[in-house]
């Protein structure tokens, strides 16, 4: 069922949302119109509420790293069970902006949370229901910070340090070399070149998928 589940991953400011829309356009050009998009954290009413709690600083209370992780997995569970699985069960394609991998990179490598806890949460919530294909948009952390600083409002995570984003990026890159379903792309290139690479890859990938 997850053959139709594709995700775009990467640091904040790497261009994930743009690429998700470009992939949807690619599918439409291939006459595949039963496509939905998702964004983590969010995508359902409850997941959106959790997303707001995660992203916005409280005036009177500090959100702990553990609470952040638990809320992310709660939001992910809501999205997976209420949106992603039902869509895939119907035969739709799902193009996601982030997935379980983000927590391993951001909360695991970035926040330095316990890997045993992360694996346990992933097993219970995801239960090996992973995307068939992940495009990881690789971009230097310095470029990320220069891009996101131009945004009007930065959320809690976007305000993190260069060393934090370096740890997150290192984890993404390491995993991309180890996992066959993670395709690493140099996202510091012009958008047109990134899209050409993705379209060519999808051409071959879809051909192999439907052999």
UniProtKB/Swiss-Prot annotation:
Enzyme Commission number, as recorded: 2.7.4.9
Molecular function terms, GO-annotated: ATP binding; dTMP kinase activity
Record field: catalytic activity: dTMP + ATP = dTDP + ADP
GO biological process, one term: dTTP biosynthetic process
One of the Pfam families matching this protein, by short name: Thymidylate_kin
InterPro entries with a match to the protein in the record: P-loop_NTPase, Thymidylate_kin-like_dom, Thymidylate_kin_CS, Thymidylate_kinase
Gene Ontology CC, one term: cytosol
UniProt-listed CDD domains: TMPK (cd01672)
Class of enzymatic activity (EC top level): transferase
Chain positions recorded as ATP binding sites: 10-17
Domain of life, source organism: Bacteria
Keywords: ATP-binding, Kinase, Nucleotide biosynthesis, Nucleotide-binding, Transferase
PROSITE patterns: THYMIDYLATE_KINASE
SUPFAM superfamilies: P-loop containing nucleoside triphosphate hydrolases
Protein family membership: Belongs to the thymidylate kinase family.
UniProt function note: Phosphorylation of dTMP to form dTDP in both de novo and salvage pathways of dTTP synthesis.
Name of the protein: Thymidylate kinase
Protein species of origin: Blochmanniella floridana
Lineage: Bacteria, Pseudomonadati, Pseudomonadota, Gammaproteobacteria, Enterobacterales
């Amino acid at each position: 069922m997850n053959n139709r589940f594709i995700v775009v991953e990467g640091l904040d400011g790497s261009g994930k949302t743009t690429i998700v829309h470009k992939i949807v356009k690619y599918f439409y050009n291939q006459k595949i119109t039963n496509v939905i998009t998702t964004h983590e954290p969010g995508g359902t009413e409850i997941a959106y509420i959790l997303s707001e709690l995660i992203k916005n600083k409280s005036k009177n209370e500090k959100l702990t790293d553990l609470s952040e992780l638990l809320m992310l997995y709660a939001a992910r569970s809501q999205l997976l069970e209420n949106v992603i699985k039902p869509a895939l069960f119907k035969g739709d394609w799902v193009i996601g902006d982030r997935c379980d991998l983000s927590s391993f990179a951001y909360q695991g490598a970035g926040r330095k949370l316990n890997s045993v806890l992360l694996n346990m949460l992933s097993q219970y919530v995801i239960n090996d229901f992973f995307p068939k294909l992940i495009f990881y948009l690789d971009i230097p952390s310095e470029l990320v910070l220069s891009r996101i600083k131009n945004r009007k409002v930065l959320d809690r995570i976007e305000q993190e340090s260069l060393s934090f984003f370096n740890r997150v990026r290192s984890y993404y890159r390491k995993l991309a070399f180890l996992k066959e379903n993670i395709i690493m792309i140099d996202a510091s290139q012009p958008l047109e070149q990134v899209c050409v690479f993705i379209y060519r890859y999808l051409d071959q990938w879809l051909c192999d998928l439907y052999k």
